[in-house]
């Protein structure tokens, strides 16, 4: 049973005694509020209460209490008095909105993907542009000119966020001696908000002149924001694909709404203020600490010299700057530039076991004190020591002990942007200059508004020998006119015909197929393809007068997550609502489900049938691919060639182009940011990778991840991992085409492509992260190679591989285009032809093997590492994602997204008394480890558990009996009953070789649970599932097929 909160002893919250009317205003030094509050916090650890300006604040000073407040099921953001004053300028923008406000949810869903890791990475050139302007100014001023560091960092960070997010240039470094009017108004606005927050309301109301000045400042800032919007609309830069473009053009996939003009202004102002103010403070404090800690400055400069040297700083260098990364972390620990955040409980709560708080109470997290909690950071918590923030130490810190970017869904969405910007600027400064304080006796004093910065911090910047920034920049400009090292992929455009390609996809396969089809349609015909999820169709209006192609999967008879509303709409149609719609449907079947006749291909079949019944005209019969047995790219290509194109030619009077490179001319394709594969993924950090198996068997690894606050999963859910191709595969391509890894590719395309366009990208990055290098070559790509072959014998052989010998030699040996090009030289094939023939890199899905309630904010994966192909080939055909995960080390960054489980593949809720039977082999144990962990948590909460059996198959106890000790402990606690089958040690499992043998041996107990309405969950290979299903059907006979389908739920993999 759960403990009764009423039994806890309630204690008053301590704090300094205030004065009537004035409260605690005399306890705070208003000129040094942060540091004087820190003294109070050390006296009243871990919590205190005081009254300021008529507002009572409960201040949190410890990591333990903060951890409670970070539970978003108990607490939510409180818009404190200071933020309430900011609302006069930003209204319900992302930072100042209340949780319940509609515009916050709308803006958050639209804009979070715009700050995804790949989008941030692509902003590096613009960041570098502004940072070089800072360095050029310092170089021109010379070593004897005092520099106001805070002012210059303010110019840098404002110009950076404006250029990267909105394509707007403030040109702050070209307005000599003065700030842009926006900055002046912003500084006054923030300072006034801080001032009003310290004054009783009756005094604040008398400050008429100050209020008038504030309104003028708000008007000026919002006018600047309107000018930014107007300029974008007038220039019609619809290919910018930046934050402003997202705000102006995107619609929310959940509600269908777009941001209003006023909401756009609110959020532009929010980003311009919050997007530069705290980052300029971070840089200022970081440089201050380096200037006053010579040992740290020397180490930092040494690291930059080792990693970057005299090269131009690139995005690849940043991940290698471990010490600089630690410097920034340690700086924000000691001086969090956004000093805190506030929450309030949903209902009365007891925190710390004895302090009562109520809804409406302002619980203010004082980060400067929390980050110095001696219980976490020790006796030297007040000292600047970057070494404590190296990855290996940082990852071992207790949860919620470092929170400079806030918490949960209300945390800063621009964190990755700010981090990349600050790291790059700091590295560029240390590469180019030696710094020294103007006043070597300088004592830190804070300049406080609603953020904090050093006050009156001046330094000299002496250019380092051989590091002339001006000469380097001129050299870059000169070199940019030469073609060497710059490869541009440009294509012609032709008179076009629109086409719409819709997809439904949980795992990314159908999305990748949709993009591949778009490329093909733009090459063979004259189509301009719009690719989007089915649920993205506005008002469910399918376009007429153009082909509509639908590519979708079916998940146990249910539509994919991004197709549910579309399917529901289809089912509501009446009469000939779809008359004039010309369509075709391609369906993917999940492995292991083809024998459920009622669900296999159910959704594609349903869509195809309903559209025909309501007046739609089929362009082609429905196509399909069983992903357990077929290569979906090959099947899609075959269906397109044999079925779709004849239908398109007849319906749209087309003449097909015979493209020699397999892709031909390109057409522009606009992919909305929430659905591009990379924008849809977030950043997770690897905590641990450990091998679970003996060296004598297939390797399986346990990967522990720290998840972003935005990912909240349940047992049974999956993580989609966007991998990188191996270095070996990338190097094979580079060697084949004789180009360097740092060769810059500039892809200009006005057509369907999943590649990054209109931005420089290195050959290494493109090949690593955007295309499938090991995908089996398709017949079309082989015919394209044959057409380009200059040798007749090679051409004939390639043509044979595309036809008669395809199944046995290409598909049978898993030959990729790379394998074939290495074996059969086709000199006329260039890198752009090759890249265009490759499908986009798609995410791989893994079931989470942990319960979120056991370790909040963390998840684990159990991965079977495919180290070689099951069948022979000319090369080691290692699994891309599994080897990528196995090669990770603590601190590695992964791109992940949450994929919800089949609603039936869920652990029954706490109120359910039905037993469960779990059956797994190998890494298929992943979801059941999560189930068992969740059951253990419930048991500790006093919940009576229904019976649970886990049947697990592996080779031998000493080889691959995964999580043995952990599961045995759970069995001893009564959480689960275990049954193991050892295929190579049958004597140790009662003569049973496989799990189906074990099930049959225990058939009496299994049937008993079945009679209690048990559900059977299975996870493993297709073959294992087939054997288990046959045995279960035999044990529970004569159960009706429909009931068996309802109570037998399987997840299978190939």
Swiss-Prot record:
It is an enzyme of class 1 (oxidoreductase). FMN binds at residues 505-509, 585-620. Its EC number is 1.14.14.1, 1.6.2.4. Heme binds at residue 412. One of its GO terms (molecular function) is NADPH-hemoprotein reductase activity. It catalyses: 2 oxidized [cytochrome P450] + NADPH = 2 reduced [cytochrome P450] + NADP(+) + H(+); an organic molecule + reduced [NADPH--hemoprotein reductase] + O2 = an alcohol + oxidized [NADPH--hemoprotein reductase] + H2O + H(+); dodecanoate + reduced [NADPH--hemoprotein reductase] + O2 = 10-hydroxydodecanoate + oxidized [NADPH--hemoprotein reductase] + H2O + H(+); tetradecanoate + reduced [NADPH--hemoprotein reductase] + O2 = 12-hydroxytetradecanoate + oxidized [NADPH--hemoprotein reductase] + H2O + H(+). Signal peptide: none annotated. GO terms for cellular component: cytosol. Binds 1 FAD. Keywords: Electron transport, FAD, Flavoprotein, FMN, Heme, Iron, Metal-binding, Monooxygenase, NADP, Oxidoreductase, Transport. The keyword tRNA-binding does not apply. Residues 499-644 form the Flavodoxin-like domain. PROSITE patterns: CYTOCHROME_P450, FAD_FR, FLAVODOXIN_LIKE. Residues 678-908 form the FAD-binding FR-type domain. The keyword Manganese does not apply. It holds the Pfam family Flavodoxin_1. It comes from the Eukaryota. Its cofactor is FAD; FMN; heme. In the N-terminal section; belongs to the cytochrome P450 family. Self-sufficient cytochrome P450 monooxygenase that catalyzes the regioselective in-chain hydroxylation of alkanes, fatty alcohols, and fatty acids, giving sub-terminal hydroxylation by acting preferentially on the omega-2 position. Produces 10-hydroxydodecanoic acid as a major product when dodecanoic acid is the substrate. Produces the omega-2 hydroxylated product, 12-hydroxytetradecanoic acid as major product when tetradecanoic acid is the substrae. Prefers fatty acids as substrates, since it hydroxylates the small amounts of dodecanoic acid formed in the presence of an excess of 1-dodecanol. This is Self-sufficient cytochrome P450 monooxygenase CYP505C3.
């Amino acid at each position: 049973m759960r403990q009764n909160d009423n039994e806890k002893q309630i204690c008053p919250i301590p704090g300094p005694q205030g004065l009537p009317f004035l409260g605690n205003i005399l306890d705070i030094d208003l000129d040094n509020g942060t540091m004087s509050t820190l003294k109070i916090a050390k006296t009243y650890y871990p919590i205190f209460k005081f009254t300021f300006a008529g507002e009572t604040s409960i201040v949190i000073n410890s990591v333990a209490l903060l951890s409670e407040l970070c539970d978003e099921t108990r607490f939510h953001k409180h818009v404190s008095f200071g933020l309430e004053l900011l609302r006069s300028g930003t209204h319900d923008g992302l930072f100042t909105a209340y949780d319940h406000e509609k515009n916050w949810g709308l803006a958050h869903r639209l804009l979070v993907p715009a700050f995804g890791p790949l989008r941030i990475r692509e902003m590096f050139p613009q960041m570098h542009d502004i940072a070089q302007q800072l360095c050029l100014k310092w170089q021109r001023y010379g070593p004897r000119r005092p520099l106001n560091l805070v002012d210059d960092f303010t110019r840098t960070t404002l110009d950076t966020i404006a250029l990267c997010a909105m394509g707007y240039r403030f040109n702050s470094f070209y307005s000599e001696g003065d700030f842009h009017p926006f900055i002046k108004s912003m500084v006054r606005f923030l300072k006034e908000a801080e001032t009003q927050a310290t004054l009783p309301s009756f005094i604040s109301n008398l400050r008429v002149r100050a209020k008038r000045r504030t309104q003028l400042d708000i008007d000026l800032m919002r006018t600047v924001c309107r000018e930014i919007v107007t300029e974008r609309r007038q220039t019609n830069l619809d290919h910018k694909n930046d934050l402003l473009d997202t705000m102006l053009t995107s619609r929310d996939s959940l509600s269908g709404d777009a941001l209003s003009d006023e909401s756009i202004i609110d959020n532009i102002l929010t980003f311009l203020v919050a997007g530069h103010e705290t980052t300029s403070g971070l840089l200022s404090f970081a440089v201050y600490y380096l200037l006053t800690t010579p040992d740290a400055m020397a180490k930092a400069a040494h690291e930059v010299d080792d990693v970057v040297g005299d090269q131009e700083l690139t995005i690849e260098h940043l991940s290698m700057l471990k010490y600089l990364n630690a410097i920034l972390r340690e700086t924000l620990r000691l001086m969090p530039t956004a000093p805190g955040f506030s929450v309030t409980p949903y209902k009365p709560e007891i925190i710390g076991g004895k302090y009562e708080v109520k809804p409406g109470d302002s619980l203010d997290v004082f980060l400067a004190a929390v980050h110095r909690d001696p219980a976490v950071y020790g006796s030297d918590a007040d000292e600047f020591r970057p070494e404590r923030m190296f990855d290996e130490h940082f990852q071992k810190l207790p949860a919620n002990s470092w929170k400079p970017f806030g918490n949960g869904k209300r945390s800063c969405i621009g964190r990755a942007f700010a981090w990349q910007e600050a790291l790059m600027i700091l590295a560029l400064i240390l590469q180019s200059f030696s710094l020294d304080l103007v006043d070597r006796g300088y004592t830190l004093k804070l300049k406080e508004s609603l953020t904090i910065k050093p006050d009156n911090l001046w330094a000299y910047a002496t250019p380092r020998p051989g590091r002339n920034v001006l000469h380097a920049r001129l050299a870059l400009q000169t070199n940019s006119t030469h073609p060497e090292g710059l490869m541009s992929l440009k294509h012609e455009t032709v008179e076009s015909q629109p086409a719409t390609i819709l997809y439904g996809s949980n795992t990314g396969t159908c999305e990748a197929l949709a993009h591949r089809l778009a490329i093909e349609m733009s090459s063979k015909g004259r189509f301009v393809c719009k690719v989007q999820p089915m649920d993205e169709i506005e008002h469910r209006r399918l376009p007429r007068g153009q082909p509509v192609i639908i590519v979708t999967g079916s998940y146990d008879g249910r539509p994919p997550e991004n197709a549910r509303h579309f399917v529901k709409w289809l089912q509501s149609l009446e009469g000939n609502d779809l008359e004039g719609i010309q369509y075709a449907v391609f369906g993917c079947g999940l492995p292991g489900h083809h024998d459920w006749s009622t669900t296999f291909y159910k959704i594609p079949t349903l869509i195809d049938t309903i559209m025909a019944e309501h007046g739609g005209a089929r362009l082609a019969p429905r196509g399909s691919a069983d992903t357990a047995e077929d290569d979906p790219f090959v099947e899609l290509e075959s269906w397109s060639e044999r079925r779709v194109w004849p239908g398109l030619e007849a319906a749209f009077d087309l003449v097909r182009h015979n493209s020699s490179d397999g892709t031909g001319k390109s057409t522009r394709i606009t992919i909305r940011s929430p659905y591009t594969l990379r924008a849809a993924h977030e950043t997770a950090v690897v905590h641990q990778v450990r091998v679970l198996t003996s060296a004598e068997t297939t390797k399986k690894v346990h990967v522990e991840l720290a998840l972003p606050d935005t990912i909240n999963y349940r047992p049974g859910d999956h993580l989609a991992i966007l991998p990188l191709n191996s270095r070996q595969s990338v190097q094979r391509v580079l060697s084949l085409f004789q180009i360097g890894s740092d060769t810059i590719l500039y892809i200009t395309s006005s057509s369907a492509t999943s590649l990054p366009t209109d931005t420089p990208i290195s050959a290494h990055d493109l090949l690593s992260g955007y295309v499938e290098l090991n995908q089996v070559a398709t017949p079309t790509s082989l015919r394209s190679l044959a057409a380009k072959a200059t040798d007749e014998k090679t051409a004939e052989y390639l043509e044979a591989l595309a036809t008669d010998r395809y199944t046995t030699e290409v598909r049978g040996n898993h030959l990729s285009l790379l394998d074939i090009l290495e074996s059969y030289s086709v000199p006329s094939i260039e890198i752009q032809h090759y890249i265009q023939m490759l499908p986009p890199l798609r995410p791989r899905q893994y079931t989470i093997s942990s319960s979120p309630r056991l370790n909040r904010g963390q998840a684990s994966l159990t991965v079977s590492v495919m180290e070689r192909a099951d069948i022979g080939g000319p090369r080691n055909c290692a699994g891309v994602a599994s080897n990528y995960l196995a090669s990770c080390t603590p601190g590695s960054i992964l791109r992940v997204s949450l994929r919800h489980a089949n609603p039936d593949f869920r652990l029954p809720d706490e109120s359910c008394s039905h037993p469960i039977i779990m059956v797994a082999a190998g890494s298929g144990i992943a979801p059941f480890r999560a189930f068992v962990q969740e059951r253990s948590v419930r048991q500790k909460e006093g919940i009576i558990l229904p019976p649970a059996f886990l049947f697990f198959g592996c080779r031998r106890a000493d080889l691959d009996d995964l999580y043995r000790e952990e599961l045995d402990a759970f069995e001893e606690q009564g959480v689960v009953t275990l049954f193991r089958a050892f295929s190579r040690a049958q004597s140790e499992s009662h003569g049973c070789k496989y799990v189906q043998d074990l099930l049959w041996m225990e058939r009496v107990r299994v049937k008993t649970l079945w009679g209690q309405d048990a559900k059977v969950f299975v996870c493993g290979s297709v073959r294992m599932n087939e054997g288990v299903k046959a045995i279960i059907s035999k044990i529970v006979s004569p159960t009706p097929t429909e009931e068996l389908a309802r109570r037998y739920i399987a997840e299978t993999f190939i």
